[in-house]
């Protein structure tokens, strides 16, 4: 499973890259606004850092506007993926952009049928929001299972990006189900490293090491 970072914070991206586990980045208008920096300045820096896919979102509600914005975003870098909302107008934009070779990521997906529509429209990626669905139903991961089954049944090439990830269990369950990608906040990625027994074991090893005579280092 690929690990994407859901952020527009360049420092977080740099740290994740140092760990050697970052495969891509997803952003949205909210994450961009939190940086307090000009849009193009932030995006340019991210695209220079990251080799993998970087999702950038359109803000228009009509297909014509999404297509126009999508083309502009695609010009910023070869690895740009255009995020499009799961609406009828959005699917029109997906068809147009994908026909031009511009990859799309259909976002704000909350049902298997929405994901099916996105795949039939030819979207490169689909982003089901598990955390937000858990908030109202507790069935976020069931959604991923159902989408994966549908895509497998009909051999769609659309990749599943598990989004709205709240905690490490979402990451674990995504991997167990076999999702293609999990995009997560930096704090969740950090938590994946942690286990109390790891800390206890390391502390014990270091204490025992101090007892070793004539240590080489």
From Swiss-Prot:
Q: Which CDD domains match?
A: Transaldolase_FSA (cd00956)
Q: Which residues form the active site?
A: 83 (schiff-base intermediate with substrate)
Instruction: Enumerate the Gene Ontology biological process terms.
Output: carbohydrate metabolic process; pentose-phosphate shunt
User: Which compartments does it reside in?
Assistant: Cytoplasm
Q: Any idea of its EC number? A: 2.2.1.2
Its pathway, per UniProt, is:
Carbohydrate degradation; pentose phosphate pathway; D-glyceraldehyde 3-phosphate and beta-D-fructose 6-phosphate from D-ribose 5-phosphate and D-xylulose 5-phosphate (non-oxidative stage): step 2/3
Q: Which reaction does it catalyse?
A: D-sedoheptulose 7-phosphate + D-glyceraldehyde 3-phosphate = D-erythrose 4-phosphate + beta-D-fructose 6-phosphate
- One cellular component (GO) term of this entry: cytoplasm
Keywords, ordered alphabetically? Cytoplasm, Pentose shunt, Schiff base, Transferase
Q: Which Pfam families match?
A: TAL_FSA
Q: What is its main location?
A: cytoplasm
Q: Name one GO molecular function term.
A: transaldolase activity
Question: According to its UniProt record, which protein family does this protein belong to?
Answer: Belongs to the transaldolase family. Type 3B subfamily.
What function does this protein fulfil? Transaldolase is important for the balance of metabolites in the pentose-phosphate pathway.
Task: Name it.
Answer: Probable transaldolase
* Species the sequence originates in: Aquifex aeolicus (strain VF5)
Instruction: Give the gene that encodes this protein.
Output: tal
